[in-house]
Amino acid sequence: MPAVMIQGTGSDVGKSLLVAGLCRAARRRGLSVAPFKPQNMSNNAAVTADGGEIGRAQALQARASGLEPLTDMNPVLLKPESDHGSQVIVQGRRVGTLRARDWFERKPALMAPVLESFARLTAAHDLVIVEGAGSPAEVNLRRGDIANMGFARTAGVPVVLAGDIDRGGVIAQLVGTQAVIDPEDAAMIAGFLVNKFRGDVRLFDEGYRLIEARTGWRGYGVVPFFPEAALLPAEDALDLGRPTGQGALTVAWLAFSRVANFDDLDPLKQEPGLTVRMVRPGQPIPAEADLVILPGTKSTRGDLAFLRAQGWDVDLRAHHRRGGRVLGICGGYQMLGRSVADPEGLEGAPGVTEGLGLLDVETVMHPDKRLTRVAGRHRASGAELTGYEIHIGATEGPDCARPFAEIEGRPEGATSADGRVVGSYLHGMFGADGFRRAFLESLGAATSDLAYDARVETVLDALADHLETHVDVAGLLALAR
């Protein structure tokens, strides 16, 4: 099968970025290439062209490949709902919620849909670049594995192991992985990469040779730190944790415990007229905030309780009294209303949770999940909007008579009577340049000529150039068989 797999010595070593860059490099070689991640765990999901959902990292990799995202690119997606359980998405569709112990019993059965999706991709493309999850060194998770060596051995896909030198101990990461995994698993590893190097790469020559000597693996390169990665859609909410920009207008966003689809904020953090700040648990909402954003969440009622535990409900009311603006997106929109009812217990115990009361609307959860890409117009400015909806529940009430947008002929969202509180189910709205400028101008912010989608394309090309300079890309892609 024409595939090669990038696994890592741990989480956050840069696997997703490496795969995106390799996909773009392969595409520029004239290859039909597709990304594939057997299993992902993320509340940051993308709606696919075939009406399902996958991890947003795979959607970015699809973009790097010149493809529309498809459910086959990430056949198993786990969306954490609590510390002990996750919603399970198989080939784009919700199949239920499992506690961690139940997941480990059920996951071996998911190898069949994983292989089915993989087979469709390999049949349709010259090359498939596979991304692992976490680390194969977590040998306590090896039984029934579908994400790393369990998949690689079953599908016969060679592996390149990536280590992260930025966090230190990369020699131990790589050599140690070989030491703890089964010999049959180790035999699948054809080589290694050292990622996120800072400084003079020549200073690591001895360490690089030592890894080759200790493991017998071929080194495919040392990849210097790529700072432009900050301009790509964030894969982890922590990527947005550092305040960005020094603009006159301050946007604060609330870091819920189950925050989802937080890459809605990416275009804002690149606007020079804004200062974008994450409000972490235990911190107050800054008094200087002009706009407070309540982002999406995987657990609306749970994160409403979390919000109140931080005192953010009090802060939000004070912010509103001072004349501040509030925007709720998806789950954040649901929180802004008078109540959130979950009669079937879709997010926990059945019941009704009192909302923040900043919008005169009510939400009722129901099991039918809305997964769709949409286009329309912002009601206030007339600017074109594009984005996607990914939610359960329906929201109704008097403030819906003042919709945020017109989406494909229907009103969407709600606006308070004073016009300072807005809610919408539309993710990705700030990627639409015209709307973003109009919205920010309505807040009094200085806007720029940022063309967000074009910038993402430029950065993906720069990432491919970066890998071509520092990695034996031709040799690595030649491993595919």
Curated annotation (Swiss-Prot):
It comes from Cereibacter sphaeroides (strain ATCC 17023 / DSM 158 / JCM 6121 / CCUG 31486 / LMG 2827 / NBRC 12203 / NCIMB 8253 / ATH 2.4.1.). Pfam families: CbiA, GATase_3. This is Cobyric acid synthase. The active site is at C330, H427. The gene is cobQ. Belongs to the CobB/CobQ family. CobQ subfamily. The keyword Transcription regulation does not apply. Keywords: Cobalamin biosynthesis, Glutamine amidotransferase. It comes from the Bacteria. The keyword RNA-binding does not apply. Pathway: Cofactor biosynthesis; adenosylcobalamin biosynthesis. GO terms for molecular function: ABC-type vitamin B12 transporter activity; catalytic activity. Catalyzes amidations at positions B, D, E, and G on adenosylcobyrinic A,C-diamide. NH(2) groups are provided by glutamine, and one molecule of ATP is hydrogenolyzed for each amidation. Residues 248-435 form the GATase cobBQ-type domain. Signal peptide: none annotated. GO terms for biological process: cobalamin biosynthetic process.
